[in-house]
Amino acid sequence: GTDDSEGNAIFVVNAETGDLVWKAVQGGGGGSATVFEHPRLTDSIPSTLAAGDTDGDGFTDRLVVGDTGGNVWRADIHGPDTSRWKLTLLASLGRHGTGASGIATDRRFFHRPDLVPSKDGDGMFDAVVIGSGNRPDPLDMGGMTTNFAFMIKDRHVAPGSGVNENLQLGDLGDVTSNCLQSDSPCTVDLTDGWRLMLTEPGEKVLATPLTITGKVFFT
């Protein structure tokens, strides 16, 4: 994949008037009260965004989405002061990741993630569940890109608390061959989440994941 000059932005608009409220775009960090710039926002965003309410007041204040470069983004839009709204990089799981090179790491996110408020022994977190796959080529059986199903633990759950974590593939525990096939307890480090490799040639995720009572379903 290559960087995109279109589609690499997030817009918040007034539903009644269509007026711009706030947007996040690629740039050097200048911006204004209604424009936030992030230098890493270089890939298009083809899906809708997952929305969350971090403080339970009935208003959306957290957005999460993936892009076609394998990045996962978090937008904090808490409160009426848009100059405090921000976009942060939660994870880099594709061609922009540390040590990534070639088509094998050209992972793309075409579908909205599932955002699930959760808790473990380390405290509260938002589970960001997402899967990679090149949707424009669903019948590709070449298997040249290694796709995954992911669950990322975003522990910055307080309103406006997002930071550029930039989690990498290796930060997520690999559950492909040592957790799902065994009845014994999983010993993989799941502090930041997990990754499940899709091992069949051309295998990819082609829909938004669905989480029900602790179980995740991928298509």
Spans of model-derived segments:
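Beta-propeller fold recognition
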Residues: G1-T219
